[in-house]
Structure formats: structure tokens, C-alpha cells
From Swiss-Prot:
Protein name: Eukaryotic translation initiation factor 3 subunit D
Keywords, sorted A to Z: Acetylation, Cytoplasm, Host-virus interaction, Initiation factor, Phosphoprotein, Protein biosynthesis, RNA-binding
Principal subcellular localization: cytoplasm
Assembly information from the UniProt record: Component of the eukaryotic translation initiation factor 3 (eIF-3) complex, which is composed of 13 subunits: EIF3A, EIF3B, EIF3C, EIF3D, EIF3E, EIF3F, EIF3G, EIF3H, EIF3I, EIF3J, EIF3K, EIF3L and EIF3M. The eIF-3 complex appears to include 3 stable modules: module A is composed of EIF3A, EIF3B, EIF3G and EIF3I; module B is composed of EIF3F, EIF3H, and EIF3M; and module C is composed of EIF3C, EIF3D, EIF3E, EIF3K and EIF3L. EIF3C of module C binds EIF3B of module A and EIF3H of module B, thereby linking the three modules. EIF3J is a labile subunit that binds to the eIF-3 complex via EIF3B. (Microbial infection) Interacts with Norwalk virus VPg protein.
Region (RNA gate): 285-299
A single GO BP: cap-dependent translational initiation
Disease: Defects in EIF3D are associated with some cancers, such as prostate, breast and colon cancers. Disease susceptibility may be associated with variants affecting the gene represented in this entry. Down-regulation inhibits proliferation of cancers.
Protein's organism: Homo sapiens (Human)
Pfam families associated with the record: eIF-3_zeta
Residue numbers carrying Phosphoserine: 161, 528-529
The protein's role, per its UniProt record: mRNA cap-binding component of the eukaryotic translation initiation factor 3 (eIF-3) complex, a complex required for several steps in the initiation of protein synthesis of a specialized repertoire of mRNAs. The eIF-3 complex associates with the 40S ribosome and facilitates the recruitment of eIF-1, eIF-1A, eIF-2:GTP:methionyl-tRNAi and eIF-5 to form the 43S pre-initiation complex (43S PIC). The eIF-3 complex stimulates mRNA recruitment to the 43S PIC and scanning of the mRNA for AUG recognition. (Microbial infection) In case of FCV infection, plays a role in the ribosomal termination-reinitiation event leading to the translation of VP2.
GO cellular component, one term: eukaryotic 48S preinitiation complex
């Protein structure tokens, strides 16, 4: 039979609701709330999310102002407590006081958080600059599609200009920071010993070329002689009677500006008795002009790509040869030196020979070094009063302005030529320093620079001339921060080291991946083809002397 159980009724005479709290709900904190409150985030670990004070209480409860569930991180857990959050009316002074106190606390908290993560605390102006930098960086990445760190090309190890064999012994090692401190002032005035060759006159119409009146670069078939020191008949003749150190201007310029070089290069040194001969190896890339060698990100394409370092060097050399002849008044009157070109045979057509003159000069470096150098001029120019000035003509070429932080020459060359030469100085510092050293050694009055660009960025066979610029070598050396005293100091240091070596053949090699040059001793038989030719020449000279 069903039975009715009488429930327990709790009487609350002073109010409504139960008089006692059930056991399962005892000691549970309670915060009044409203179902109309906006829901905030479940968890926010980023700290101060809202910089603007207007949005600080965006998601806070509007019904109950309590913070019973708030967590305060301290050293122990005694901070879990119920606090009285009843709001009291504050005076205007108190409100301002609390506002400033909260701002100071918030600033101190941000400073502690930044110090915890080793972040730099910036002043207000620096913060604005930092935000502007980040904004521009994001804009640049959006426009040009800069790769992220995980997709960036790593710097590949560069190859040496010549393979170092196991039987080569290191005799000396010089690092660039040490060489950059060298200074030498005891350099005498140069003395001209012999001048050979003929020069064509510069066509001043090329000074009026602009980006709007660009001129196509023509392919000019002329012979350029790149004869090394020991193969020069004039130097062989002079070595019998005078001088104890012999070299060409290109070899000396490589040594004098070596601290700017990045790629590997090598120079052969022969110690014969008390004489030194600085040579270049046959069939080497010594005479090729590097492109963007000193840029932050030099070209790294491989294989047959027309933007590979070697193909760019061949393209630059081709451009330099053609421009140095096209800007002259070819086939017309020439300026002739007393002696003919020593490398031209009698049956050769004079118009097929490039306009180059050779000036053999002598310097005294102290009391013990008698230096003889073969220097070159590329052309001659007449002034307003008819005076003759010798010039060196070189070419800067644009291959792709999107690489190596370049600037578009067609847009900037006429209006902002300073920005163009500054970018070239950054990307081709070593090449410009070599050209300047060659002009200083030769005593040229001017250094002519031509600006040549590809007709199309994807076509490395056609080029256009966009303009020219003229510098005095001494002023240009100061402009590119080339110290002549340091250049002579490096050369004197290298000569002194080689003079201390025993008789034989040595190799000066720039390390491909470090700022170091080393002097190797070469065993007998190294570069045997060169040695055989030299022995044959010595035998022929001895036979001629016996006959006379």
C-alpha cells in the first residue's frame, strides 16, 4: 500500500529560502552575476591585451563587481581569499590619484614582463620608430615577397681559385684586420722608364648620353693583350739592369686593395736570386671582373644560369672591353708614344689592336726595394685649352636591380646618380678599389666610368649605355674611403715577407671563405707548363748572349 512521507519543512521567519546550506555546497564562494553579461575569453595569457583604457572593462561583469575567482600569483597560495569589492564614492582628487597609481603600476608590470623575456625597454619616441619599422617591414614583405627564415638561401661555401694540394706548405698567413692597420709613407715619386703603344681619343658625345637617349652597346672585335709579368719582353730586358721587384698594375692593385675582396684569387711569386716577380697563372680567372662581390647577398646561381657568378663575371668583362673601345673615336687620329706596342707583331693590322698604352714606372720603397710596374692607359682626352689628359675607362653594369638591394638605373641614374654610385660602392667595393689603384699607379688624370645595363633583365647578350661619369683618381679614392698609405703598407708587407723566403716559386692565395691570405711554397713541378716555357726562354736568352 502506498505510503506518503512527510517532507522536512524549513521555516525561515527572517527571510525566504533555506535556513541551512547543504553539505555539498558548504564553503563554496559565490559571486552575483547577470545572464545579460557579455562573455569574455576563457583564458588570456598575453598579459595586457588592451592598450586603450576604453576597452579595459569590455568583458567584465556589470552586475557584480567582485573578484572572488581572481587569481593573484604570489610566492605561496595564501593569496586565495575573499575580498570586499564594495565600491565607495571617491573624490576627484582620489580618482586622479588612483588613475596615476594604476598607470605607474601598469608601467612597472610591463617593464618587469619585458625584462623577464630579455626585451629592450624603449622610450616613447623609440617605440614609435620601432612600430614604424615593423610596419614598413611588413609592407616590404607584402610587396616583394621576401622569404621567411625557413626558406632563405643559406650562404654556400665558395670555391678556391686553385685547388690546394697536400704537398703545399703554408709559409705565412695574414688576416685582413692586421693588414688594414698597415701604413707606409716612404714612397718616392714615380719615374717613367719607358712608354709604349698608341691611344685613341675619347669621344665626348658619350658624356651627353642619358637614360632617355640610351645608346646600344656594340660588339667590337679587338685584341686585348693580358700578358703576365715574366712574359713581358720589356720587363725581361729591364730586369737585367735595374729593379728587384717586378709586377703589373693589375697584380699590385689586387694586393693593395685585398682587404675588400670576398672571392678567392691567387698570385704566383717567383724568387730568383735577389729579385721578385709577381705573376698570374695561365688560363686563370684573374682578369675577369667580379659582379656584386661585396654585396650582402651576392649572386649564388649555379650551373649555366646567366646570373651565376662566373657568367656574370664574363658578361662584365665583355661589357668593359666593348665600352672602353666604343667610347673612343675609332679609326681616327691616335696619340703615339715613343715606342710601339711590345706585344704587337709587324704583320698585324693596327685597327684590330685595342687602344692601350703601357707605361713602365719605377718606385723606390725605402732603400732596399726598387719596384718596376707595367701600368696601362685606355685612352686620351683633350681639354678646353688643348692639353692632353690620359684616362682609364671602366664600366659598371646593371644585371638585375631586384637583387643585391640595387636601384633601377633607368629611374635613378639621371636624378639620383649619387644613390647609384653609393649602391655600386657597397656591392662592388673591391672592383672599384682595384680600378682606382690602377689609375693611381698609371698616373691617369681621370677615371671614366660607364653605366651599362641589360636591354632586358632576362637577356645577357644585349646591352645599352645609360650614361658616363668622370672622376679624378685621388678624389675618388677619398670618396670610396681608399687609403693610399694603407695600400702601400699592404704591398710593402707582402714584399718583405716574400723577400725573406728562399729561392723558388710561391703562391699567394686568398681564402675563399675567410678574411685571410696565405703564402704557400710550391714544390718542383707545380705549374710545369709555365716552368718549361720559362726554361726554354732562359736557354734562348743564354744562347743569344753567347752569340753576341
Amino acid at each position: 500500500m502506498a505510503k506518503f512521507m512527510t517532507p522536512v519543512i524549513q521555516d525561515n521567519p527572517s527571510g525566504w529560502g533555506p535556513c541551512a546550506v547543504p553539505e555539498q555546497f558548504r564553503d563554496m564562494p559565490y559571486q552575483p552575476f547577470s545572464k545579460g553579461d557579455r562573455l569574455g575569453k576563457v583564458a588570456d595569457w598575453t598579459g595586457a591585451t588592451y592598450q586603450d583604457k576604453r576597452y579595459t572593462n569590455k568583458y567584465s561583469s556589470q552586475f557584480g563587481g567582485g573578484s572572488q575567482y581572481a587569481y593573484f600569483h604570489e610566492e605561496d597560495e595564501s593569496s586565495f581569499q575573499l575580498v570586499d569589492t564594495a565600491r565607495t564614492q571617491k573624490t576627484a582628487y582620489q580618482r586622479n590619484r588612483m588613475r596615476f597609481a594604476q598607470r605607474n603600476l601598469r608601467r612597472d608590470k610591463d617593464r618587469r614582463n619585458m625584462l623577464q623575456f630579455n626585451l629592450q625597454i624603449l622610450p616613447k619616441s623609440a617605440k614609435q620608430k620601432e612600430r614604424e619599422r615593423i610596419r614598413l617591414q611588413k609592407k616590404f614583405q607584402k610587396q616583394f615577397g621576401v622569404r621567411q627564415k625557413w626558406d632563405q638561401k643559406s650562404q654556400k661555401p665558395r670555391d678556391s681559385s686553385v685547388e690546394v694540394r697536400s704537398d703545399w706548405e703554408v709559409k705565412e698567413e695574414m688576416d685582413f684586420p692586421q693588414l688594414m692597420k698597415m701604413r707606409y709613407l716612404e714612397v718616392s715619386e714615380p719615374q717613367d722608364i719607358e712608354c709604349c703603344g698608341a691611344l685613341e681619343y675619347y669621344d665626348k658625345a658619350f658624356d651627353r648620353i642619358t637614360t632617355r637617349s640610351e645608346k646600344p652597346l656594340r660588339s667590337i672585335k679587338r685584341i686585348f693583350h693580358t700578358v703576365t709579368t715574366t712574359d713581358d719582353p720589356v720587363i725581361r730586358k729591364l730586369a737585367k739592369t735595374q729593379g728587384n721587384v717586378f709586377a703589373t698594375d693589375a697584380i699590385l692593385a689586387t694586393l693593395m686593395s685585398c682587404t675588400r675582396s670576398v672571392y678567392s684569387w691567387d698570385i704566383v711569386v717567383q724568387r730568383v736570386g735577389s729579385k721578385l716577380f709577381f705573376d698570374k697563372r695561365d688560363n686563370s680567372d684573374f682578369d675577369l671582373l667580379t659582379v656584386s662581390e661585396t654585396a650582402n647577398e651576392p649572386p649564388q646561381d649555379e650551373g649555366n644560369s646567366f646570373n651565376s657568378p662566373r657568367n656574370l663575371a664574363m658578361e662584365a668583362t665583355y661589357i668593359n672591353h666593348n665600352f672602353s673601345q666604343q667610347c673612343l673615336r675609332m679609326g681616327k687620329e691616335r696619340y703615339n708614344f715613343p715606342n710601339p706596342n711590345p706585344f704587337v707583331e709587324d704583320d698585324m693590322d693596327k685597327n684590330e689592336i685595342a687602344s692601350v698604352a703601357y707605361r713602365y714606372r719605377r718606385w723606390k720603397l725605402g732603400d732596399d726595394i726598387d719596384l718596376i710596374v707595367r701600368c696601362e692607359h685606355d685612352g686620351v682626352m683633350t681639354g678646353a685649352n688643348g692639353e692632353v689628359s690620359f684616362i682609364n675607362i671602366k664600366t659598371l653594369n646593371e644585371w638585375d636591380s631586384r637583387h643585391c638591394n640595387g636601384v633601377d638605373w633607368r629611374q635613378k641614374l639621371d636624378s639620383q646618380r649619387g644613390a647609384v654610385i653609393a649602391t655600386e660602392l657597397k656591392n662592388n667595393s673591391y672592383k672599384l678599389a682595384r680600378w682606382t689603384c690602377c689609375a693611381l699607379l698609371a698616373g691617369s688624370e681621370y677615371l671614366k666610368l660607364g653605366y651599362v645595363s641589360r636591354y632586358h633583365v632576362k637577356d645577357s647578350s644585349r646591352h645599352v649605355i645609360l650614361g658616363t661619369q668622370q672622376f679624378k683618381p685621388n678624389e675618388f679614392a677619398s670618396q670610396i674611403n681608399l687609403s693610399v698609405e694603407n695600400a702601400w703598407g699592404i704591398l710593402r708587407c707582402v714584399i718583405d715577407i716574400c723577400m725573406k723566403l728562399e729561392e723558388g716559386k710561391y703562391l699567394i692565395l686568398k681564402d675563399p671563405n675567410k678574411q685571410v691570405i696565405r703564402v704557400y711554397s710550391l714544390p718542383d713541378g707545380t705549374f710545369s707548363s709555365d716552368e718549361d716555357e720559362e726554361e726554354e726562354e732562359e736557354e734562348e736568352e743564354e744562347e743569344e748572349e753567347e752569340e753576341t
